[in-house]
Amino acid sequence: MNKNIVILGTQWGDEGKGKVVDCLTKDSSYVVRYQGGHNAGHTLVVNDKKIILHLIPSGLLHKNVIGIIANGVVVSPFELIKEIKMLETHNIFVHKRLFISNSSPLILQYHIEMDIAREKKLGISALGTTGRGIGPAYEDKIARRALRIGDLKNEKTLSIRLEKIVNYYNHQLVSFYKHKPVDYKIILRDLLPTIDLIYDMIKDTTSILHTAIQSNKKIIFEGAQGSFLDIDHGTYPYVTSSNSTIGGVITGTGVGSKSLDYILGVTKAYSTRVGYGPFPTELFDDVDKHFSKKGHEFGSTTGRKRRTGWLDAVALCRSVRINSLSGLCITKLDVLDGLHEIKICTAYKNINTLEIISFPDIDEWKNIEPIYETYPGWNKKTLGIKKLIDLPYEARNYINRIEEITQIPVDIISTGPDRSDIIFVRDIFFIKK
């Protein structure tokens, strides 16, 4: 039996991981966020109510589940408290079953101001960050100057270290970026009241997870963003600041690779991307309008319109290999309903050399042309279908072709936004390794 399951995105984020996590954690004991921050946006629809989570693990909507925000996550205490209070309006109370790693770096106002100042100075060369301070917070971690969640437990030390780091940031903000400075006293004043609200949640989460594994508890590891936003394996520099591929699970939790039983890659039935960066299958036609309208392709974190395109199987296959995926979950299959034909990108061609490229360098992307296979679409609605056999023949053929190209099984298919709109082809908890 598979106890410990990783769920991660195979594209550029927004694949629908939150819903999949929500569906699988009803039978689990723990759900763990291991990287990213509140730049993630996991949208769940429960009883026709939309709930968007940016920081708290999606599986906490189930009242029997314990949530972990592990050491790989950068945490804004203000955003965390805001989410906790939002969940309480839905009668979901998490104070006694949510734990935060004492090693998680803090996101504070100076990170946000630095993020905004940099994007403004870059102008048309901006990376398109969410402006929430994620990158600067990870920089502090790597530079070994970060304030961490555990520092909140010692007010005197916190005050001294905070003043030093505010001075460091203000020197850059004012002198180089010509940006307004931040006020150390205001940051400290606003931060102190948050301590009492989350004090009891601050734990050594690595030890909690080790104990859970030794006790044979089921654990879901919930990824944020997608594989091609990974700082090392993504379309650099148009990436996030953390490891959103499988390596982020290990470093971001302290759980060893041998403890991971099954790795599920979540992919849309087509492709989307928010912000700048390479996107070889991008569309600018009526199909783009179809995807945007029917798929509601607007970012849950930024509200920006997502770029849309056909499924990129070259990128998907690379993601399969990078993450050692056990199986796939195809989401938003219903968005393809009504299309006359459907395409899959199976190779990249350099338009100058006509050479087939496995995965381009950053300067090569502009010369890449996708090579497509074309398949017939379907007119029957797939929305809400719960059995594989009930899908139209053409839809099943499309799924089969994805399995052939990637050489791994499609174990789950999402056919709509509600948590009940799902096909479990195989029970991933009981698939033999």
From Swiss-Prot:
Entry keyword set: Cytoplasm, GTP-binding, Ligase, Magnesium, Metal-binding, Nucleotide-binding, Purine biosynthesis
Keyword Metal-binding found: yes
GO biological process: 'de novo' AMP biosynthetic process; IMP metabolic process
Cofactor or coenzyme needed: Mg(2+)
CDD domains documented for this protein: AdSS (cd03108)
Pathway stated in the Swiss-Prot or TrEMBL entry: Purine metabolism; AMP biosynthesis via de novo pathway; AMP from IMP: step 1/2
One of the record's GO cellular component terms: cytoplasm
Location of this chain's protein in the cell: Cytoplasm
Quaternary structure annotation from Swiss-Prot or TrEMBL: Homodimer.
Catalytic center residues: D14 (proton acceptor), H42 (proton donor)
Binding site for GTP: 13-19, 41-43, 306, 332-334, 414-416
List of residues binding IMP: D14, E15, G16, K17, N39, A40, G41, H42, T130, R144, Q225, T240, R304
Entry's cofactor comment: Binds 1 Mg(2+) ion per subunit.
Record-given protein name: Adenylosuccinate synthetase
Superkingdom of the organism of origin: Bacteria
Binding site for substrate: S300, T301, T302, G303, R304, K305, R306
The keyword Cytoplasm appears for this protein: yes
Main location: cytoplasm
EC number: 6.3.4.4
Function: Plays an important role in the de novo pathway of purine nucleotide biosynthesis. Catalyzes the first committed step in the biosynthesis of AMP from IMP.
Enzyme class: ligase
SMART domains: Adenylsucc_synt (SM00788)
Family, per entry: Belongs to the adenylosuccinate synthetase family.
A Pfam family this chain is assigned to: Adenylsucc_synt
InterPro entries in alphabetical order: Adenylosuccin_syn_GTP-bd, Adenylosuccin_syn_Lys_AS, Adenylosuccinate_synth_dom1, Adenylosuccinate_synth_dom2, Adenylosuccinate_synth_dom3, Adenylosuccinate_synthetase, P-loop_NTPase
Reaction(s) this enzyme catalyzes, per UniProt: IMP + L-aspartate + GTP = N(6)-(1,2-dicarboxyethyl)-AMP + GDP + phosphate + 2 H(+)
